[in-house]
């Protein structure tokens, strides 16, 4: 009887470990040019596979250069109440990829990595950016049926400050930091030292995208450790 009892305890213990480790970590990478140019297969996937196991991660990248947040947030309007004819096209394609790659899969954590904002800054739509980003997160929570999504925001670099071409540039940086700071599951990543020499808006400086990848991975691991125990 004692032997049976011990075997039962061992069995339950093993089940608990399995249950705790069950599921895969889903990483969603989205945004405009600096996310589109980011070589995730080289600078992101190997690191998260090493951290969690190649069979324990799903990575989906959906990005396109020069796109405003309205291509993701479906209810986007300008401060004047103007609305584009079409919204949410890139969001729809992202969700389609998620559904395809996660069908029948138990998801342990979701981390949304966002690198976007240049287009909205240049267009003068900084004043509605926070509202739009929060709306985008609500879309994700609803469509993924999760309230525990981790968020990483790649803050705009200091490119616009150096060029002095857009007085709204610093305002957007502050908005992005506030969005991260107000959410316990979010953080922002500094990119000021990653500017390229020729096209300084993009991170083509030697090792720029590699360093960006390292920061994404470090931030993601920290958020997952803190929030998805």
Predicted regions and their residues:
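Sec-dependent N-terminal signal peptides
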Residues: 4-13
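Cell-envelope and extracellular/periplasmic
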Residues: 20-229
């Amino acid at each position: 009887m004692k032997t049976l009892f011990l075997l039962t305890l061992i069995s339950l213990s093993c089940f608990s470990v399995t249950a705790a480790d069950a599921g895969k970590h889903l990483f969603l990478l989205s945004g405009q040019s600096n996310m589109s140019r980011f070589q995730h297969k080289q600078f992101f996937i190997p690191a998260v596979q090493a951290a969690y196991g190649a069979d324990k991660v799903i990575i989906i990248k959906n990005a396109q250069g020069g796109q405003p947040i309205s291509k993701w947030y479906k209810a986007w309007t300008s401060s004047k109440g103007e609305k584009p004819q079409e919204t949410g096209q890139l969001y729809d394609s992202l969700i389609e990829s998620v559904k395809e790659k996660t069908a029948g899969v138990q998801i342990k954590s979701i981390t949304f990595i966002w690198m976007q904002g240049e287009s909205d800054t240049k267009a003068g739509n900084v004043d509605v950016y926070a509202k739009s980003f929060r709306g985008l997160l609500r879309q994700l929570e609803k469509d993924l049926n999760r309230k525990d999504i981790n968020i990483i925001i790649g803050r705009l670099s200091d490119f616009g400050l150096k060029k002095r071409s857009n007085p709204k540039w610093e305002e957007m940086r502050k908005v992005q930091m506030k969005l991260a700071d107000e959410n316990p599951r979010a953080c922002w990543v500094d990119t000021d030292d990653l500017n390229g020499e020729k096209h300084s808006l993009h991170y083509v400086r030697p090792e720029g995208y590699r360093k960006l990848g390292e920061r994404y991975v470090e931030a993601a691991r920290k958020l997952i450790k803190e929030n998805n125990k």
